[in-house]
Each structure stands twice: as C-alpha cells, then as structure tokens.
C-alpha cells in the first residue's frame, strides 16, 4: 500500500482493515483504463504486468497485447491468466527495445516508482504511435498538505470500498503481497515535474487508494 499518513500508523490501520475486507488497489483502476483506450488498437504493452489481470482485460480490444515483467514468477502467472487468449505475449522486454511509434497503448499500474522516471517517460514518448496513449496508475510519497489530505481521504474511503466489495470479513487474515512491492520515493509534485517536462499536456490527478493517475495522448 506504500507510504501513508501519520508516520505510517494510518497505513497500518488501513492494512488491518483491508486484510478483513480485502480489495486490490490496483485492479480497482482497470475500469478507468478500459474507459480511456485509444481509437487505434493494434499493439498494447502493459509494463509490470504482475498476475496478468489487466493484460487479459485488454486482449479483446487490441490486435496484440504484450505483458512485460522482470519477475519470472509474475510472467508465469500472467501466462496462466491469459492461457485462454491467443493474442497475448508475455515477455521480459523493456520499453527501450520497441521501435519508434510502434505501440498504441502503454499501461503501468504501481510500476513507475520502481523505474527511472525520466528515462521511462522518454521511452514512452518515443515508442507511442501518434494518438497513442499512456495510462499510469502510480504511487508517490506524501509530502505536501494536498498529498496528506488525499491520504486522509484514502484512509476514510479504503474500508468503505473494501466493505462494499467484501462485506464478510476474510477468514484468511493478512496475506503476503501478490507481487514485489517498493515504497515510492518521489512525491506527487516531483513526479508531475518530470511528466510535464517530458510529456507536455499530460493530466495527473490524485485518486483514492493512495494512488494517482497519469494520462497522456501523443499528438497526432
């Protein structure tokens, strides 16, 4: 879940509630991604594909989808999740290996803070085709008063979302993270400075679930 309000105590409280009424802070945003797909849909790349849920959801909308992850177990899980579709490739390729303007959609969920942000965004700008889209669900370290306010909102809404989705307490209790985790280092404002400098016109917003979103359409 990452860094949170009140020296981490808020995060500990939320984690305890989330263990009783679990929901995925990352999967929650799949619907946002599916609602913002580009008009041309040849190739999509999900960077940091994890267990493959988003790759599987994108498959019906694109000619081909590539799920990328450096973790071999995550690639294995994505392969299993997508075993019923024929237009998916799972790979450890990195963005720098794609040709210029060859991809219509690049997605990243809770991944960008693992990467060198400036290098990654430059590769995104190069690889995306005209009118292609970048859709990011990210995490940032809370530092400004606005960041802390959004953390407070997430602390309040987190158990409500979990309770609505899973009204009965989970008997399993707290489970280990299903994918490698890392707390973010850059703040929202620091991420935004890089985004604005490299991807002019991108939209970045705070969201619930201790997340933010970045949306950018490459000029046609």
Question: Where do the PLM segments sit?
Answer:
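Class I SAM-dependent methyltransferase SAM/SAH-binding core
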Residues: 51-53, 57-96
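A short, conserved alpha-helix within the catalytic core of class I
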Residues: 115-124
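Class I SAM-dependent methyltransferase Rossmann-like catalytic core
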Residues: 11-25
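Conserved beta-strand signature within the Rossmann-like core of class I S-adenosyl-L-methionine
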Residues: 132-138
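C-terminal alpha-helical "lid/dimerization" subdomain adjacent to the S-adenosyl-L-methionine
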Residues: 141-194
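A conserved beta-strand element that flanks and buttresses the S-adenosyl-L-methionine
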Residues: 107
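Conserved class I S-adenosyl-L-methionine
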Residues: 42-50
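Conserved alpha-helix/loop element of class I SAM-dependent methyltransferases that forms part
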Residues: 24-42
């Amino acid at each position: 879940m990452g860094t949170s309000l009140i020296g981490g105590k808020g995060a500990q409280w939320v984690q305890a509630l989330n263990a009783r009424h679990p929901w995925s802070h990352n999967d929650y945003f799949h619907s946002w991604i599916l609602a913002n797909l580009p008009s041309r849909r040849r190739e999509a790349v999900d960077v940091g594909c994890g267990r493959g849920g988003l790759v599987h959801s994108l498959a019906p909308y694109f000619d081909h989808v590539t799920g990328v992850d450096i973790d071999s177990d995550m690639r294995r899980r994505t392969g299993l999740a997508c075993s019923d579709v024929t237009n998916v490739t799972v790979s450890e390729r990195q963005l720098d290996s794609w040709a210029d303007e060859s991809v219509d959609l690049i997605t990243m969920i809770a991944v960008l803070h693992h990467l060198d942000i400036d290098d990654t965004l430059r590769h995104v700008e190069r690889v995306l085709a005209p009118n292609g889209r970048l859709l990011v669900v990210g995490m940032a370290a809370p530092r400004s008063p606005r960041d802390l306010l959004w953390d407070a909102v997430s602390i309040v809404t987190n158990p409500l979302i979990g309770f609505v989705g899973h009204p009965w307490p989970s008997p399993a209790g707290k489970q280990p993270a299903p994918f490698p985790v890392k707390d973010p280092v850059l703040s929202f404002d620091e991420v935004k400075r890089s985004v604005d400098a490299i991807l002019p016109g991108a939209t970045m917003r705070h969201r619930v679930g201790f997340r933010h979103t970045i949306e950018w359409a490459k000029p046609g």
